[in-house]
A protein has these predicted regions:
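A short, well-ordered alpha-helix in the C-terminal region of glycosyltransferases
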Residues: 358, 365, 372-387
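Conserved donor-binding/catalytic core segment of Leloir-type glycosyltransferases
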Residues: 217-235, 241-244
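N-terminal subdomain of nucleotide-sugar transferases
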Residues: 1-61, 247, 425-430, 443-449
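Nucleotide-activated donor-binding/catalytic signature segment of Leloir-type glycosyltransferases, i.e.
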Residues: 259-260, 265-292
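Nucleotide-sugar-dependent
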Residues: 235, 287-296, 301-322, 327-340
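Carbohydrate-associated surface elements
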Residues: 44, 177, 199
């Protein structure tokens, strides 16, 4: 089966987002299903580096990568982003037509114009396409106040979005909340919209010892609450900062570490400085190879979303937190995918956005009940290994791809191994330079994230 994946960003971009997610999916597919021949059409740009340019062609993981020399949408004006997105979509369509016939095209939503390219390519060649909705626009732009809800451009974009979804052979979304939203708002039959989670890398991200290099480098002691990832406008940071202010006087051992960058970084830094929230530390992104060490540095990891964003996206960082074997505290609505997994797997606590008292209470509870935090962390890793590894996700994609392309599905090269988390509630922490250590789930100083 010949498959072409089209996305603006791809390997070696390792700064998160759809490029990194699709790179990991491609590697997992090529490893377990070598009969799948994959080409990738992407850009020469890196997501967080405006100046860097990659080579126009590369081979990686037995995959051909074709990079288009198109302008980067970046973080400029809405008009500039729309024009850059349109140029990439048109260039991708031209490239598709020069590469020969494929059995299937797989596209994401970076940029949203890719669906137009895939739809046109299907019309010209009868090639089916899978439409993976990572972030749903224009709905997300409307919720963030970028586009007026009833403007002519919004209505036009919604009509296009509905057409692209209808023409796709399958729409793939990241969670049940997204499936419910898409079927309701765009009138699609439930069987046309399939849920496949993002998944996490259970090999690169492990339940490491709490004695991390990150903690040592930043002199972090006590109970560490960590947020790592994009400081985007659709994340609820004010609730986190308000909770930090409340805990400043009552729980002096609690430290908040916010690692990343994005649209809200200046706002966060301004509040921390002006309001003297001294228990909050704001740090830049860490390299990918240090990410597992970062996640192991916290006793609790945070997931946030602004109200109304459920159904439009699912934070990918959540699955990395599961892989780290740490509990999650999430300020999200109860019907979001994150909240559902937390409840189903008993691997964290959820409160609605703006619930400062609830967030303070949740963090204080886990601070004073480390055995419960340890149990939740154990459950998190167990859930990841049983349901949400990259290999599990690749298997779901492979079956869907074969159905859409009308190809015979072959077994994976290696069967999916059962969970390596032992059934006795013991996680094995890997410590750099030392032998692995068994830590009972009931111990009092375990599972710091």
């Amino acid at each position: 089966m010949r498959v072409c994946i089209v996305n603006e960003f791809f390997y070696p971009d390792d700064t998160g987002g759809t490029g990194m997610v699709l790179s990991e999916l491609t590697a997992a597919l090529r490893h377990d299903y070598p009969s799948v021949q994959i080409d990738v059409i992407t850009s020469v740009n890196l997501y967080r580096d405006q100046a860097a340019r990659l080579s126009v062609y590369e081979e990686w993981e037995n995959t051909r990568i074709f990079r288009l020399q198109t302008p980067q949408a970046g973080f400029r004006t809405t008009r500039h982003r729309l024009m850059a997105n349109a140029k990439f979509g048109m260039a991708a369509l031209r490239k598709l037509r020069t590469l020969g016939r494929y059995d299937l095209v797989l596209i994401g939503t970076a940029p949203p114009t890719l669906a137009a390219a895939a739809s046109a390519y299907k019309r010209l060649t009868k090639t089916p396409y899978l439409y993976v909705v990572y972030d749903l626009d224009p709905d997300r732009a409307v919720r963030m106040g970028v586009l007026p809800a009833r403007s002519p451009i919004t209505r036009l974009l919604r009509s296009w979005q509905k057409s692209w979804m209808q023409k796709a052979d399958q729409v793939l979304v990241l969670g049940r909340c997204m499936q419910e939203y898409v079927t309701r708002q765009y009138g699609l039959p439930p069987e046309h919209v399939q849920v496949i989670p993002i998944g996490g890398d259970h090999e690169a991200i492990r339940p490491l010892s709490p004695c991390t290099r990150f903690r040592a480098a930043h002199n972090l002691n006590g109970f560490v609450v960590c947020y790592s990832g994009n400081f985007g406008r659709y994340h609820d940071f004010d609730t986190v900062l308000d909770a930090a202010k409340c805990l400043l006087g009552t729980e002096p051992t609690v430290k908040f570490v916010l690692v990343g960058g994005g649209a809200q970084k200046a706002h966060i830094e301004r509040r921390v400085r002006d309001e003297d929230i001294s228990n909050v530390m704001v740090l830049p992104f860490v390299p990918k190879e240090e990410y597992s060490d970062l996640l192991a540095s916290a006793d609790v990891s945070l997931v946030t979303l602004e109200p109304g964003m459920e159904g439009l996206c699912v934070p990918s960082k959540f699955y990395s937190i599961l892989a780290s074997g740490r509990p999650t505290v999430a300020t999200v609505s109860a019907h979001s995918e994150v909240a559902r997994v937390l409840a189903e797997e008993d691997c964290g606590l959820q409160m609605v956005q703006g619930d400062i008292v609830g967030l303070v209470g949740a963090l204080s509870h886990l601070l004073h009940h480390p055995e419960e935090a340890a149990r939740m962390g154990y459950n998190a890793r167990k859930a990841l290994e049983e349901k949400y590894t990259n290999r599990h996700v690749a298997a779901l994609y492979y079956q869907t791809m074969c159905r859409a392309a009308g190809c015979v599905a072959f077994p994976a090269k290696q069967s999916l191994s059962p969970t390596r988390v032992p059934p006795n509630g013991v996680l094995r922490f890997a410590s750099p330079g030392n032998a692995e250590k068994s830590t009972p789930a009931a111990a009092t100083a375990v599972l710091p994230d």
